UniProtKB/Swiss-Prot annotation:
Function: Catalyzes the interconversion of L-alanine and D-alanine. May also act on other amino acids.
Cofactor: pyridoxal 5'-phosphate
Sequence similarity: Belongs to the alanine racemase family.
Name of this protein: Alanine racemase
Parts forming coiled coils: none
Reaction(s) the record says it catalyses: L-alanine = D-alanine
Length: 352
């Protein structure tokens, strides 16, 4: 069997939730959209079932999957519905929909609901994706408030640069949000992972923990308070010694400078490892750091082995405990979200 493995450490997930909940105060949503960032939404949700105040997903299907698996917690639909008919499933599965534009608002208001619904009303405080502009927000709020079908309203927005503390954008967005919601009663939600960790003023009634929930710092590098949940590993299935000036891999992008011992490992871009990861991207053999050399192939890649490192059959960590996923992402010119969400053809093992 091909030895590409993903370990999901559910104990680390629970640890991270507790840390983030303590930092934020109030209530905390565990964001499990995109199959919990590649970790497995149902397994992660059940691991957090006795801790989490609620969960957040992106699509109706993600919410339904949690409900049908037995999750009874509040589930926020962060993008709302994509067509008016989806409000039927919102009601059937007791989801809390976000409303971030005029047609979503109107479709909700004209529908005859059999039971009341809790709405998350989104403001565009400066990111300019979805949400009502600050000057339109009060009127959208008032329309919902007047509806007999709306149980309560959570006012929320999303930060564009909370992971860039020196940008000043988070302060600008908080000011816009506070001005646009002035005098409007109800709960609020502003803090994503970066704001939970670094912006106390953004910690309102509800936090939304995404990346940090999975043990990854949104600021790059590591964070000693968090424990990585995902560990991706494989094994060396071939090794050889190459002479000086030997090219390696497609495109001959790397030449050995001396006699070099190399290992072939079972992971490539078809498995989700980024093809654009350059030579020198870190991996670890039995806990000792080394590097990728040559171009990443579809099903395999080459790593350098020194004289002290074990070879054939030994484990190689691609990211997890020794290799920080942020380092891999930075080398490949991408972000850890993309790496985790792209994993395929691997065996998943869940460790309590």
């Amino acid at each position: 069997m091909r030895p590409l493995n993903v370990q999901i450490r559910l104990g680390n997930l629970r640890h991270n939730y507790r840390i983030l909940k303590e930092m934020h105060g109030g209530k905390l949503l565990a964001v499990v959209k995109a199959d919990a960032y590649g970790h497995g939404a149902v397994r992660c949700a059940f691991a957090l079932a006795d801790l989490a105040d609620g969960f957040a997903v992106a699509t109706i299907d993600e919410g339904i999957r949690l409900r049908e698996s037995g999750i009874t917690h509040p589930i926020v639909l962060l993008e709302g519905v994509f067509e008016a008919s989806e409000y039927e499933a919102v009601e059937q599965y007791s989801l809390w929909p976000a409303v971030g534009n005029q047609w979503q608002l109107e479709a909700l208001l004209i529908r005859h609901w059999k039971k009341t619904v809790k709405v998350w009303l989104k403001m565009d405080s400066g990111m300019h994706r979805t949400g009502f502009f600050p000057h339109d927000y009060a009127s959208a709020y008032a329309a919902l408030k007047q509806s007999e079908y709306v149980d309560s309203i959570v006012k929320f927005s999303h930060f564009s640069c909370a992971d860039e503390p020196e940008s000043g954008m988070t302060e600008i967005q908080m000011e816009a949000f506070d001005l646009g919601t002035e005098g409007l009663e109800g709960e609020e939600s502003l803090a994503n992972s970066a704001a939970i960790l670094n912006v106390p003023e953004a910690r309102r009634d509800w936090g939304r923990a995404g990346l940090a929930l999975y043990g990854i710092s949104p600021f790059g590098g590591g964070d000693d308070r968090l424990k990585p949940v995902m560990r991706l590993s494989t094994r060396i299935f071939g090794e050889r010694v190459l002479q000086p000036h030997s090219p390696i891999g497609y495109g001959a992008t790397f030449y050995t400078s001396k006699s070099t011992r190399v290992g072939l490992i079972a992971c490539g871009y078809a498995d989700g490892y980024p093809r654009r990861a350059p030579s020198n991207s870190p991996v670890a053999v039995d806990g000792k750091l080394t590097r990728v050399i040559g171009r990443v192939s579809m099903d395999m890649m080459t790593i350098e082995l020194d004289a002290s490192q074990e070879g054939l059959g030994h484990e190689v960590e691609l990211w997890g405990d020794t290799v920080n996923i942020n380092t891999v992402a930075e080398a490949a010119g991408t972000i850890p979200y993309e790496l985790m969400c792209n994993i395929k053809r691997a065996k998943f093992t869940y460790i309590e």
